[in-house]
Amino acid sequence: MRWIQESGFYRGTGDKMIRPAIIGWREWVGLPELQRAPLLSKIDTGAWSNTLHAADIEIIESRPESRIRFRLEEEGGWVERPIQRWRRIRDSGGHETLRPVIRTTIEIASRDFDIEVCLADRSTLKHRMILGRNFLRLGFIVNPSRQCIHTMIRSEERIEMGSMD
């Protein structure tokens, strides 16, 4: 049974209650199935879906499932994942594109989630990953005056992919 308390402060399934985490307009996230270093992600309340930068995208048609092969960085190693589905995305200019969707684990604010992520070439954009409203529904509130509220503890050095600050 899924419910939301009237005050909006708690969300839960069955007996488990989760207090929403406050996050900034951008946060460090972990993508343990895709790369080792944390990634600086923009929280985009104007977007519905999540999008991750992918370079050199190749579709591998096979049975029973199609797969996608891509790089997270131009010089990085290859990543291969099953394609969950294709999603039609409309950008702010009204242009529609069809994007492949994969599932992966994301770590943020000391929590892990299995999420869907659209893949697209974001090499010319400031942030290599955006998290949209469907992600925020998992139990997050955005404080637009703050950034990087939650740290990622990793032995590897942090990499701010694509940031032009």
Language-model region placement:
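Pepsin/retropepsin-fold aspartyl endopeptidases
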Residues: R2-W3, G8-D165
